[in-house]
A protein has these predicted regions:
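Conserved short histidine dyad/triad with adjacent acidic residue
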Residues: 40-55
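Well-ordered beta-strand scaffold positions
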Residues: 42, 67, 75-77
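Short acidic-glycine-tyrosine-enriched beta hairpin
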Residues: 75-89
Length: 127
């Protein structure tokens, strides 16, 4: 079992080409004995974004703070606190902070990370 306050885990820059002002912390993952999912918290600066990308695994997102737009395929959707997002496998997606304060969201991804290289996993802060 693990009980931790998110702010006790340092934020690390997302080191993937196309990421702007994006940081991540791995809250719970395989290293903690979680057999099925990794829970990450992202923080994106105003005007920042995650890279536009796709991968073989799904993920689920829950917006905690800020306003954003998510691009999924050719559609863009506005996000606000309390919004949940399901990103299916192999769909091109990107999260952009459209507000004037930091965007914070939780992102859950499954194990194993099908289609995600170890380099990409490390760049997202969850080795």
């Amino acid at each position: 079992m693990k009980v931790v306050h998110c702010e006790s885990i340092p934020l690390a820059p997302v080191q993937i080409e196309g990421a702007v002002g994006a940081k991540v912390r791995c809250l719970i993952g395989e290293q903690d004995g979680a057999p099925s999912f990794t829970m990450r918290q992202f923080e994106i600066a105003p005007g920042g974004c995650t890279p536009k990308h796709a991968h073989a695994h799904e993920h689920e997102v829950f917006v905690l703070e800020g306003t954003a737009a998510v691009l999924m395929g050719n559609a863009e959707h506005a996000l606000q606190p309390g919004t949940a997002v399901f990103v299916p496998p192999n769909v091109v997606h990107q999260f952009r902070n459209t507000g004037s304060s930091p965007l914070k969201f939780l992102c859950l991804i499954p194990h194993p990370l099908r289609g995600m290289s170890q380099t990409c996993v490390a760049a997202c802060g969850c080795e």
